[in-house]
């Protein structure tokens, strides 16, 4: 008969300072299918180390160990996990049940890593618990069960995937005599059903119930009777749960990891909330700064556009503040006509201006009088609350008409409901009011200077008596590059004048400068907010490292029942990501509240959340969870199952 478990010259040593301490010294042992074997020995004899090697939790330093003819030394970590999952079931002295899971959920754990569907897992767990007399305790937590009941749950867990080989480490060590008898009776039943039962104990009475007692002393076998040739197997073996395909196993493991992550968060609500707080503040800061910053930028740009966009202003002289007399008459009406003929010009509006006194009845105020064309108001985004702008007939005829701004209207006509048709004095020239222009409210504030507008022909011919222009505003056609238009305009006037006695001011250049400046400021503020997100991520990493330390034994249990290192990595990584995702969702909610509050105090701001901003926030949460959860998850996955099980 071929042995099920075959050990040849197994040695196991551990480093102790500069030396190696040999715990197992050339163990040679054969165990056959269906046997009930007891391994006995005093504390420190090496029996627990031997059990760990038998259960593929540990590897021998030298020697050969075969399971069903397969040399375990040739297997990688995942293959060893599969071997434990499909062939071995562990029963521990201290039960090693997961305290936050019910009895039924504890029994299900091995099948989770085998990729068994939830419905099948549930039925199998209920069947095993019913067989072991715990059908009325399926929803109980370990703390609600007696020691004997916990050990029976442990046995059911060992049988979940079939449990061809049952490894029982001091299964009765923490039980009273009655519970001890119950557990031993169950082990005998398992042996009768065809399971190979290996009991590690120091109790002679427990060992005496085995068919074969192997004694180990100081790492060497001192008694090893031959195996019984015929093993009585009354019933069939347990149905073996085969490992599912890679995809099914991944999906099952992912769902279980997600469920376990949620339970872990719910078990420590205050700590979880405090951990999330950093993520909440970080995400809320990033989203709020992006959204509110964008609203502020749009407000600034809207104010600039209200002044007039896609326009180029032409002034006489070398630059602002140049009052050299030789340049004052640089711009002529012929220049205006030449500019209007260019194919890239939508309109060209001249301007002449002078500070004058305005009088109506007994009201006398100072104002800025501006001679413009009818297109001026459209170029600068102005609307009319009363009346309208000049028409071409009024421009050609130098009509004595005037448009007031709203401030001038209030000064001259504080009690009149309609001022169109009223006559005022502009300087010494009577002029009929034909409209009241409303300038767009700007976040930069309004000018305190009273302003009126007359036809440029009237202003230059009747009021000022000059033949030159103070400035020309050129509106560029849509789709034409403003910078190129500015170059062509400069070239045109330079050729006409024979020199460059003027300068230009491009509003689009100002707009681009403002856009660049606001974008830079927004980026800087976002980077500051990202720092708070990083701090929150470090908090997540810290708590996850603490969690790994606190749950070391749980990790060992999961590895013992068949979890791979990748399963453990996935478990803790999902927990970190879940913390960050929930924190991210709360952070977005907080940023919405901040935005709505600001909207109440700043009604002119258009604060909106684009789907892209929300998507980026969730991506930030996920990436934060992955980045800062990777190290703790990797540490958990690298734990040695034997060391993990030994920790309290």
UniProtKB/Swiss-Prot annotation:
Predominant location category: membrane
Keyword flag Translocase: yes
Organism domain of life: Bacteria
The UniProt record lists the keyword Transmembrane helix: yes
Pfam families, alphabetized: ABC_tran (PF00005), FtsX (PF02687), MacB_PCD (PF12704)
Localisation per UniProt entry: Cell inner membrane
SUPFAM superfamilies: P-loop containing nucleoside triphosphate hydrolases
One CC-aspect GO term: plasma membrane
GO biological process, one term: response to antibiotic
Record's keyword terms, sorted: Antibiotic resistance, ATP-binding, Cell inner membrane, Cell membrane, Membrane, Nucleotide-binding, Translocase, Transmembrane, Transmembrane helix, Transport
InterPro entries, sorted: AAA+_ATPase (IPR003593), ABC3_permease_C (IPR003838), ABC_transporter-like_ATP-bd (IPR003439), ABC_transporter-like_CS (IPR017871), MacB-like_ATP-bd (IPR017911), MacB_PCD (IPR025857), Macrolide_Exporter_MacB (IPR050250), P-loop_NTPase (IPR027417)
Positions annotated to bind ATP: 41-48
Membrane topology type: Multi-pass membrane protein
Segments forming domain ABC transporter: 5-243
Matches recorded under Gene3D superfamilies: P-loop containing nucleotide triphosphate hydrolases
Molecular-function annotations in GO: ATP binding; ATP hydrolysis activity; transmembrane transporter activity
Membrane-spanning intervals of the chain: 273-293, 523-543, 576-596, 611-631
Chain segments annotated as coiled-coil in the UniProt record: none
Top EC class, one word: translocase
EC assignment: 7.6.2.-
NCBIfam families the UniProt entry points to: PRK10535.1
Subunit structure: Homodimer. Part of the tripartite efflux system MacAB-TolC, which is composed of an inner membrane transporter, MacB, a periplasmic membrane fusion protein, MacA, and an outer membrane component, TolC. The complex forms a large protein conduit and can translocate molecules across both the inner and outer membranes. Interacts with MacA.
Family: Belongs to the ABC transporter superfamily. Macrolide exporter (TC 3.A.1.122) family.
Designated name of the protein: Macrolide export ATP-binding/permease protein MacB
């Amino acid at each position: 008969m071929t042995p099920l478990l075959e050990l040849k010259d197994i040695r196991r040593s551990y480093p102790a300072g500069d030396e190696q301490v040999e715990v197992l010294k050339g163990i040679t042992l054969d165990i056959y299918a269906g046997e009930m074997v007891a391994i006995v020995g005093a504390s420190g004899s090496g029996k627990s180390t031997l059990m760990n090697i038998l259960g593929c939790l540990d590897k021998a330093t030298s020697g050969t160990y075969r399971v069903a003819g397969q040399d375990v030394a040739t297997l990688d970590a995942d293959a060893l996990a599969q071997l434990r999952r499909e062939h071995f079931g562990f029963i521990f002295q201290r039960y090693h049940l997961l305290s936050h899971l019910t009895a039924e959920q504890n029994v299900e754990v091995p099948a989770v890593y085998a990729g068994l569907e939830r419905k099948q897992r549930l039925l199998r767990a209920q069947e095993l618990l019913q067989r072991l007399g715990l059908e009325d305790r399926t929803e109980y937590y370990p703390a609600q069960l007696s020691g004997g009941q916990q050990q029976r749950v442990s046995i059911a867990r060992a049988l979940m995937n079939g449990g061809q080989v049952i490894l029982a480490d001091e299964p009765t060590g923490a039980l009273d005599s009655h519970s001890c008898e119950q557990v031993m009776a169950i082990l005998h039943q398992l042996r009768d059903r065809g399971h190979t039962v290996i009991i590690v104990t120091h109790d002679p009475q427990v060992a005496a119930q085995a068919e074969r007692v192997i004694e180990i002393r100081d790492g060497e076998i001192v008694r090893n009777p031959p195996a019984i040739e015929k093993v009585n197997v009354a019933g069939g073996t347990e149905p073996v749960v085969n490992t599912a395909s890679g995809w099914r196993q991944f999906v099952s493991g992912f769902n279980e990891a997600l469920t376990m992550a949620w339970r872990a968060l719910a078990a420590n609500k205050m700590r979880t909330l405090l951990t999330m707080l950093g993520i909440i503040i970080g995400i809320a800061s990033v989203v709020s700064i992006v959204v509110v910053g964008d609203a502020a930028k749009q407000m600034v740009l809207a104010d600039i556009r209200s002044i007039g966009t896609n326009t180029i202003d032409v002034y006489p002289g070398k630059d602002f503040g140049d009052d050299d007399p030789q340049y004052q008459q640089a711009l002529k009406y012929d220049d205006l006509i030449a500019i209007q003929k260019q194919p890239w010009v939508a309109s060209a509006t001249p301007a002449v201006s002078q500070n004058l006194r305005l009088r109506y009845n007994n009201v006398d105020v100072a104002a800025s009088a501006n001679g413009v064309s009818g297109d001026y108001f459209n170029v600068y985004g102005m609307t009319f609350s009363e009346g309208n702008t000049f028409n071409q007939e009024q421009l050609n005829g130098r009509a004595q008409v005037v448009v007031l701004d709203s401030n001038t209207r209030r000064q001259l006509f504080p009690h009149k409901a309609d001022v169109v048709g009223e006559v005022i004095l502009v300087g010494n020239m009577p002029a009929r009011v034909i409209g009241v222009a409303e300038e767009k409210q700007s976040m930069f504030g309004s000018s305190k200077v009273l302003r009126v507008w007359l036809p440029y022909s009237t202003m230059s011919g009747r009021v000022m008596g000059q033949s030159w222009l103070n400035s020309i505003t050129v509106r560029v056609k849509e789709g034409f590059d403003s910078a190129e238009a500015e170059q062509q305009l400069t070239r045109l006037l330079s050729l006409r004048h024979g020199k460059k006695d003027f300068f230009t001011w491009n509003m689009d250049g100002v707009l681009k400068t403002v856009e660049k400046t606001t974008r830079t400021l927004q980026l800087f503020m976002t980077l500051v907010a990202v720092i708070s997100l990083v701090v929150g991520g470090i908090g997540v990493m810290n708590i996850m490292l603490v969690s790994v330390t606190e749950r070391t034994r749980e990790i060992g249990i999961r590895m013992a029942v068949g979890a791979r290192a990748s399963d453990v990595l996935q478990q803790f990584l999902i927990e970190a990501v879940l913390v960050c995702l929930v924190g991210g969702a709360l952070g977005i909610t907080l940023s919405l509240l901040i935005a709505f509050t600001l909207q109440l105090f700043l009604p002119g701001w258009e604060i909106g959340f684009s789907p892209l901003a929300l998507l980026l926030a969730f991506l930030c949460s996920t990436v934060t969870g992955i980045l800062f959860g990777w190290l703790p998850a990797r540490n958990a996955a690298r734990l040695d199952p034997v060391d993990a099980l030994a920790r309290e």
